[in-house]
Amino acid sequence: MSAPARVLVVDDSATMRGLITAVLSSDPEVNVIGQAGDALEAREAIKRLNPDVLTLDIEMPNMNGLDFLEKIMTLRPMPVIMVSTMTHRGAEATLAALEIGAFDCVGKPAPGELRPFGDLAEKVKAAARTQRQYSQPVVAVAPPPSVADFRVGRKIVAIGSSTGGVEALIAVLQKFPANCPPTVITQHMPPTFTKSFAERLNRLCAPVVQEATDGARLEIGKIYLAPGGERHLQVSGASAPCCRLIDRAPVNGHRPSVDVLFDSVAELAGRNAVGVILTGMGRDGAAGLLKMRHAGARTLGQNEKTCVVYGMPRVAHELGAVEQQLPLSAIGEEILKMTAARKEGTE
């Protein structure tokens, strides 16, 4: 049995520090070794205690969590899980933190409600196990134009991701031209965060990126991100494919679930689809990707070396759902090769 993950909890609220500590301490594989109320205390505690993982509040006095995270990633890179308020402002800051190099994020619960912290211990343990090489922040690059040598076919692209997915999706989607194939995405994220993430992707990428709405028609040049929260994203409509937001219990512990999306794409599009599974904890999406492959779709998985967490892609690969495993840098271009029209009137 491996040693428990050693965690330092950083939050300016004593109540929140106590709550996070209590949640984490209920797991025997996690050891909270200290607490800090601001960046100065945290810096000294990191030197003294040498934690495996940090939980870090976004909003703190003196130096906010985002500025402190940048210093950590420069001076002492380590896995950091951001703890943020469930607001638009909190979501924007958290997305920036994930691009800087934070491992993952959780939303602060409302009074008397602990659900956002339900998987915190699992995220901490995954963070402690990761061999990730912490890197420089994602740099926005000029997106590719709509180019004459890319003619989109009739395929739908479906992508699933979780931990590490913010950076991974940016890397993939920045390869897409403005006339990309219709693309649907489920990324595990807290409610309110997905709208901000869609807006951020829309600024960084050539296609139109939007949070999916029920009934939104799938169109060339548009990317649809499943909203976090209470419903799953599916696609339906043989003659006019569109997004559907479905009320249903969580699948694999997630809502929205990648498996639910992939299952619907397999049923609707069959061989006229490409399925992609990116970095993430657990197994969500693996069975759905296998269903897509059995239906004739092309399928890709992110390789172990470039994953923040090689969980979802690993299970998919072991099931035989993945046609090709590729480094993150190659996935966007491969999707375009698989979806381009070969000649007039073909896919």
Curated annotation (Swiss-Prot):
<dbReference type="InterPro" id="IPR001789">
    <property type="entry name" value="Sig_transdc_resp-reg_receiver"/>
</dbReference>
<feature type="domain" description="Response regulatory">
    <location>
        <begin position="6"/>
        <end position="123"/>
    </location>
</feature>
<feature type="domain" description="CheB-type methylesterase">
    <location>
        <begin position="150"/>
        <end position="342"/>
    </location>
</feature>
<dbReference type="GO" id="GO:0006935">
    <property type="term" value="P:chemotaxis"/>
</dbReference>
<keyword id="KW-0597">Phosphoprotein</keyword>
<keyword id="KW-0378">Hydrolase</keyword>
<dbReference type="GO" id="GO:0005737">
    <property type="term" value="C:cytoplasm"/>
</dbReference>
<dbReference type="InterPro" id="IPR011006">
    <property type="entry name" value="CheY-like_superfamily"/>
</dbReference>
<dbReference type="GO" id="GO:0000156">
    <property type="term" value="F:phosphorelay response regulator activity"/>
</dbReference>
<dbReference type="InterPro" id="IPR035909">
    <property type="entry name" value="CheB_C"/>
</dbReference>
<feature type="modified residue" description="4-aspartylphosphate">
    <location>
        <position position="57"/>
    </location>
</feature>
<comment type="function">
    <text>Involved in chemotaxis. Part of a chemotaxis signal transduction system that modulates chemotaxis in response to various stimuli. Catalyzes the demethylation of specific methylglutamate residues introduced into the chemoreceptors (methyl-accepting chemotaxis proteins or MCP) by CheR. Also mediates the irreversible deamidation of specific glutamine residues to glutamic acid.</text>
</comment>
<dbReference type="GO" id="GO:0050568">
    <property type="term" value="F:protein-glutamine glutaminase activity"/>
</dbReference>
<dbReference type="Pfam" id="PF00072">
    <property type="entry name" value="Response_reg"/>
</dbReference>
<dbReference type="InterPro" id="IPR008248">
    <property type="entry name" value="CheB-like"/>
</dbReference>
<comment type="similarity">
    <text>Belongs to the CheB family.</text>
</comment>
<dbReference type="GO" id="GO:0008984">
    <property type="term" value="F:protein-glutamate methylesterase activity"/>
</dbReference>
<dbReference type="InterPro" id="IPR000673">
    <property type="entry name" value="Sig_transdc_resp-reg_Me-estase"/>
</dbReference>
<keyword id="KW-0963">Cytoplasm</keyword>
<dbReference type="Pfam" id="PF01339">
    <property type="entry name" value="CheB_methylest"/>
</dbReference>
<feature type="active site">
    <location>
        <position position="284"/>
    </location>
</feature>
<keyword id="KW-0145">Chemotaxis</keyword>
<feature type="active site">
    <location>
        <position position="162"/>
    </location>
</feature>
<feature type="active site">
    <location>
        <position position="188"/>
    </location>
</feature>
<protein>
    <recommendedName>
        <fullName>Protein-glutamate methylesterase/protein-glutamine glutaminase 1</fullName>
        <ecNumber>3.1.1.61</ecNumber>
        <ecNumber>3.5.1.44</ecNumber>
    </recommendedName>
</protein>
